[in-house]
Structure formats: structure tokens, C-alpha cells
């Protein structure tokens, strides 16, 4: 099983505690995602002007990009309360009914990992989203009866990293759909500088930029790296973070300038050295790395593919010339035609 990686985009308990102190409260402080910010500002102002609950919002994108943070910002801008839960926590229809009936008019209900709602719970959610009503079964057996409960107008914000797993009926009930994109190094630099100021960390612009460029386009990773570099600077550099200190800390953490850690590099090196650059089937690769297939597909591969170091083909995984150069190796001459073309899956 893979241990927690410093560059993992999934949240940890430390991340949750630290993020609460640096989380922006207003859209003006929410850095990056400019198209999303501009659209949400219009939707929020329009809903407030009409005195209505804002339409339901679906936010999707890779983990660590600020979906939960954006939900807090939306509730703050609307001037209403936010109730936070997640799909796996809502096990029964009664759990959802309890949440919905305790909402005040125009409140925001945030459901993280909404793709993990059970079908039974989803059925209760449909009329709640459309008509602000829920049907509850009272009693058992022949004496059971259904009663309708009216709900106050509310805004549901659903967040997911797996939008493709949402059922069509649920997806169609969201009037506003927003996709969060990876951040540019410049945007992440601004985020690191802002976080450092809030946390009282002495960090130069060059030091912040060095942290940002290795953060894989993800604010959660940038803030986590900032905390680890702060630890290094506190012991080795009197608490001051500049470019050399940031670079030395990253070398200690084994995070290279591309944002890769040892597991990323090991995967690329394995494909090059053991499988002649590929293509190699994912099961063979997982066995060679002593990792689970799911870890490769969901944790390691996405960023390597996004950055152009790895490609998926019908015949398996292949590294690109960019990967050879990153490993300090000479790329092979152009492969024979047909390599990487659709063919045998095994």
C-alpha cells in the first residue's frame, strides 16, 4: 500500500486543520479560476437581488483545487449558513431528510463526493432539488404511508472528482455546473504568498515561486509544501524562506522541479528500463512496481499524462521522449509504425 505522499492531492487531517485558517472568505480573495469566479459573482448577485435561493451548483475537477473552499465562499457571499456533509456519510434517506428539514430559507447544503450517494438517497434528493419537497415513509408493512414535507428554498452544492459517475437524472438537476482547472505557477505563487502572510511565514517571492512550480497545479499541495519548507527553514535558515532554502527543502523532500516524487520517477524508470519504454500493460506494470492497479490509474498516472511524460494506448502505457530527458537518458530513435496504435489489449 502506498504511504501518504507529500505531493498527493487528497486531503489529510493536517490539511483540513491548516486550510481552515487560510481559507478565503470572499470571491475577491479566491485566487485563480477566473472564469468560475466571474460567473459565480453574477449568479450570487442576481440571486440576492431577487431575494431567492441561488440555483443548485455542481462543482467538479481534480482533488485539491478548492471545491470545498468555493462552497464556503458562495455561502459567505450569499450571507447564509452552510451545512457540510459528504456522500458516504448519508447512508439512509432519513439521514438526508434530517439535513434538509433543518435548513433555513436560502441556506446552502454542501455534499462532497456526491457521486457516492446511494440510489435510495438520490431518489429522495430529486424532489427536494426540483420542488423543495420530500416524501417520507411512515410506518411499516401494510400500515406504511407516504407523507410530503415542504422544505425551505435552499441551494445544493455538489462536489465531485468523478463527474462521469454521476447519474444523468442527478446531473441534470443542477442549474449551474462549474469545472475547476489546474492552477498556473503564477496563480499558485500568489496563493503561497497569501498563505505565508496569514501564517506569519517569512517567505520571499522567489521562494514562493519555487514552491509553486513544484505543486502540480494544486493549491492543497502548494500549501502543504509551504508548511514543510517552513519546518526546514525554521531549523536550517532561521525561519527565512528564499530561493536556495526552498530548493534545499525540496531536495530533502525528494520533490523535483516537475513536481514529481520518488514514486513518479520510479514508474517512469521502470517502464524505460524493464519494458523498453513500453507499451506495457497496467497489470504487468503494477506487479513490477509492487503497487495496486488502482493506485497507478488514480494516483500516479493522471499527472504524468497531463504533463506529457506518459501516454495510454490500447496496448498499454508508454513513456514519451520528455520522460527520457527528465531521467537524464537519451530518447530512442522514432519507433516503428504501429507502436502505440490500437491493437491487442494484453
Curated annotation (Swiss-Prot):
User: Keyword Cytoplasm on this protein?
Assistant: yes
Instruction: Summarize where ATP binds, as residue positions.
Output: 22-23, 64, 67-69, 130-132, 173, 183, 220
Which InterPro entries does the protein's record reference?
Answer: AAA+_ATPase, AAA_lid_4, DNA_helicase_Holl-junc_RuvB, P-loop_NTPase, RuvB-like_N, RuvB_C, WH-like_DNA-bd_sf, WH_DNA-bd_sf
Residues binding DNA, per UniProt: 293, 312, 317
Which residues are noted in the entry as Mg(2+)-binding? 68
Could you tell me one molecular function GO term of this UniProt entry?
four-way junction DNA binding
Keyword entries, A-Z? ATP-binding, Cytoplasm, DNA damage, DNA recombination, DNA repair, DNA-binding, Hydrolase, Nucleotide-binding
Q: Coiled-coil regions in this chain?
A: none
GO annotation terms (biological process): DNA recombination; DNA repair
Q: List the residue ranges of the region (Large ATPase domain (RuvB-L)).
A: 1-183
Q: Which EC numbers characterise this protein's activity in its record? A: 3.6.4.-
Q: List the disulfide bonds.
A: none
Q: Which GO terms describe its cellular component?
A: cytoplasm; Holliday junction resolvase complex
Family membership noted in the UniProt record: Belongs to the RuvB family.
The entry's free-text remark on domains says: Has 3 domains, the large (RuvB-L) and small ATPase (RuvB-S) domains and the C-terminal head (RuvB-H) domain. The head domain binds DNA, while the ATPase domains jointly bind ATP, ADP or are empty depending on the state of the subunit in the translocation cycle. During a single DNA translocation step the structure of each domain remains the same, but their relative positions change.
Q: Which PANTHER family match?
A: HOLLIDAY JUNCTION BRANCH MIGRATION COMPLEX SUBUNIT RUVB, PTHR42848
Instruction: Provide the function of this protein.
Output: The RuvA-RuvB-RuvC complex processes Holliday junction (HJ) DNA during genetic recombination and DNA repair, while the RuvA-RuvB complex plays an important role in the rescue of blocked DNA replication forks via replication fork reversal (RFR). RuvA specifically binds to HJ cruciform DNA, conferring on it an open structure. The RuvB hexamer acts as an ATP-dependent pump, pulling dsDNA into and through the RuvAB complex. RuvB forms 2 homohexamers on either side of HJ DNA bound by 1 or 2 RuvA tetramers; 4 subunits per hexamer contact DNA at a time.
Q: How does it assemble?
A: Homohexamer. Forms an RuvA(8)-RuvB(12)-Holliday junction (HJ) complex. HJ DNA is sandwiched between 2 RuvA tetramers; dsDNA enters through RuvA and exits via RuvB. An RuvB hexamer assembles on each DNA strand where it exits the tetramer. Each RuvB hexamer is contacted by two RuvA subunits (via domain III) on 2 adjacent RuvB subunits; this complex drives branch migration. In the full resolvosome a probable DNA-RuvA(4)-RuvB(12)-RuvC(2) complex forms which resolves the HJ.
Q: What is this protein called?
A: Holliday junction branch migration complex subunit RuvB
What gene, per UniProt, encodes this protein?
ruvB
Amino acid at each position: 500500500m502506498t504511504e501518504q505522499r507529500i505531493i498527493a492531492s487528497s486531503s489529510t487531517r493536517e490539511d483540513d486543520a491548516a486550510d481552515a485558517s487560510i481559507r478565503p472568505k470572499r470571491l475577491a480573495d479566491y485566487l485563480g479560476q477566473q472564469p468560475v469566479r466571474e460567473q459565480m459573482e453574477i449568479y450570487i448577485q442576481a440571486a440576492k437581488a431577487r431575494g431567492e435561493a441561488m440555483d443548485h451548483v455542481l462543482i467538479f475537477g481534480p482533488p485539491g483545487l478548492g471545491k470545498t473552499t468555493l462552497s464556503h465562499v458562495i455561502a459567505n457571499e450569499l450571507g447564509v449558513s452552510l451545512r457540510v456533509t459528504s456522500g458516504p456519510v448519508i447512508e439512509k434517506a432519513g439521514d438526508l431528510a434530517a439535513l434538509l428539514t433543518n435548513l433555513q430559507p436560502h441556506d446552502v447544503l454542501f455534499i462532497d463526493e456526491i457521486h457516492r450517494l446511494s440510489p435510495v438517497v438520490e431518489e429522495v434528493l430529486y424532489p427536494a432539488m426540483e420542488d423543495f419537497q420530500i416524501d417520507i415513509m411512515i410506518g411499516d408493512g401494510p400500515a406504511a404511508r407516504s407523507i410530503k414535507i415542504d422544505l425551505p428554498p435552499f441551494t445544493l452544492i455538489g462536489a465531485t472528482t468523478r463527474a462521469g459517475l454521476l447519474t444523468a437524472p442527478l446531473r441534470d438537476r443542477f442549474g449551474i455546473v462549474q469545472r475547476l482547472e489546474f492552477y498556473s505557477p503564477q496563480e499558485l505563487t500568489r496563493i503561497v504568498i497569501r498563505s505565508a502572510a496569514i501564517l506569519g511565514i517569512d517567505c520571499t517571492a522567489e521562494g514562493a515561486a519555487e514552491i509553486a512550480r513544484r505543486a502540480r497545479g494544486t493549491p492543497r499541495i502548494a500549501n502543504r509544501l509551504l508548511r514543510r519548507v517552513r519546518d526546514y527553514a525554521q531549523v536550517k535558515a532561521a525561519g527565512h524562506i528564499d530561493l536556495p532554502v526552498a530548493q534545499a527543502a525540496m531536495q530533502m523532500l525528494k520533490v523535483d522541479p516537475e513536481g514529481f516524487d520518488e514514486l513518479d520517477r520510479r514508474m517512469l524508470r521502470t517502464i524505460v528500463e524493464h519494458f523498453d519504454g513500453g507499451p506495457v500493460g497496467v497489470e504487468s506494470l503494477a506487479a513490477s512496481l509492487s503497487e495496486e492497479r488502482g493506485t497507478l490509474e488514480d494516483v500516479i498516472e493522471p499527472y504524468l499524462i497531463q504533463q506529457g511524460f506518459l501516454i495510454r494506448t490500447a496496448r498499454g502505457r508508454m513513456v514519451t521522449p520528455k520522460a527520457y530527458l527528465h531521467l537524464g537518458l537519451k530518447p530512442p530513435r522514432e519507433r516503428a509504425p504501429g507502436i502505440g496504435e490500437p491493437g491487442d489489449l494484453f
